[in-house]
Amino acid sequence: MNLLKKSLSVLAVAAMAVSLAGCGGSSSSSKSTESGEKVFRFGQSNPKVGLDMQTNTNSGASSVADNVLEGLYRWNDDNKEECVLAKDMPEVSDDGLTYTITLKKGVKFSDGSDLTTEDVKYTFERMFTPATGCTNTYMYNMITGAQDMLDGKATELSGFETVDDYTFKLHINYKFAPFVANLGMDYASIYPSDACAAAGENWGKGTNLIGTGPYVIKENDEQTKVVMVPNKKYHGKKPNLDRLEVVYIDDYSTKMMEYEQGNIDMCDLDTSLLDQYKDGDLKDEITQVTPLGTYFLSIKDNDPVLSNKAVREAISLAINRKELCSTVLNGAAEPASSFLNPGVPGHDDKLKTYEHNVKKAKQVLADAGISNPTFTCKVRQKEEKIATALQAYLKEAGITMNVETIDAGIWSSARAAGELQATVLGWFPLYADADNQMYTYYYSENAVGKGVFYNNPAFDSLMKEARESNDSDKRVELYKKADYILSREDYGTIPLYYGKLQFVAKPYVKNAKLGNLIYHLYNIDIDLSKK
């Protein structure tokens, strides 16, 4: 496919130019070895959204905040939920509507204040206060009184019942199978009431992030790096590192150059660079993982051009997913057959990869009386190659997709404001449940906040029924039907592939893991004898 190859060649030259420009600097590995300090530097793109986990869904922000903040529960590297600030898993009433939770005693925030029920109450009430602008209320708004707060009818959460300083009850409006699972997500991290309130709009900016986690933020210029040091008041095992740095490097080639020069100890390895490194000197330092998410072409379903189902169907038919995976993605992906990832219950294993048929795509447009539909796909730098490949595929079917690469921060704001006609991204549930992958993005009330504006009452009805059922087999069948409506009847989204992710880590780095898109760095250790 000459057009595709030409597009990719241009991008490759651009990437090489950036790589050669570089960003030098001497390695500090020898200094840390001589001093006996364990210093770990992780390279990642700058999320540019702050570190307040109530107001963003960015995995890069999570990888930083994850070291400072803790919730009642968390999902570990093995995708199992475990107690953190809660003493035990919740006691659930017979009707499934009341959850009683007891906090561990003796836990302090890094500012020295004690963790009590008041902090948990404050955290949830802040979440549902409209001025906060929380992006994840749909995961918790079944708590009684949450919607009243969101609608400005109340300032306190009626469904939060304080028993004493360490025990509380959460009352919910209906049975919700994933409720405890959602309490284990970063979005439900517990904030210190006094410190958070005092910080106001600056919470999550600079060093204004205080938690009960193993590290505290010492420096954060929000542009180049975040420096963390051990939390001396941590209630758990003493952190392994003396200093943890997250270094912001947006360009993939530059990031790998910094890794090769020893200026960072670990970073993600973009799939576009996999061929360059997989058989070279770094091959033994590469770890590949298969996350639960799906990469897709996200489209604004109420857009004047893309609101026409024929255009969306033609787009799907024009894309050669198998070729995309084998060429652009260097084989580190599987062509999609549904929006739900194969590892998520509700994925239909009987479905085949979405059809690729350029002739049929043209016919679908002709039958609808549509000629040369044109739209713009705005992406971040990391999705540029995928978008360029899609552009070439669509051109063969008579569809013009203009591609613009924009700053990650601008992209996040534009998506939330519903200003993107189309974009490319991956959506990853933090645990294997379709509610977390599909309801969060395409249920009509949530689709607005994601900038896709998908709205189908039949889909909503299936999703609502599934999230209120405790019958796992029934939920699976409901999710299969919902996914089929979303991605094969409405073409409300264009699933592309199930990607594999890679990272590189120096031989002296211990416990390097990627927990389904989020790098959990709090367990990282350094073997100084190998440096």
Language-model-derived ranges and their functions:
Residues 200, 232-277, 400:
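Ligand-site clamp/hinge motif
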Residues 172-239, 243:
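Gly/Pro-rich hinge or "lid" segments in bacterial periplasmic/extracellular proteins
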Residues 1-40, 50-53, 83, 93, ...:
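Short, low-complexity disordered leader/linker segments with a strong preference
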Residues 43-94, 210-211:
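N-terminal lobe/hinge region of extracytoplasmic solute-binding protein
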Residues 102, 121, 137-194:
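Surface-exposed binding/hinge segments that line
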Residues 318-346, 382-389, 415-531:
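Detector for C-terminal structural segments
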Residues 116-123, 165-171, 213-214, 242-243, ...:
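Alpha-helical secondary-structure segments
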Residues 88-136, 169, 305:
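Aromatic- and charge-enriched surface segment that lines or borders ligand/interaction sites
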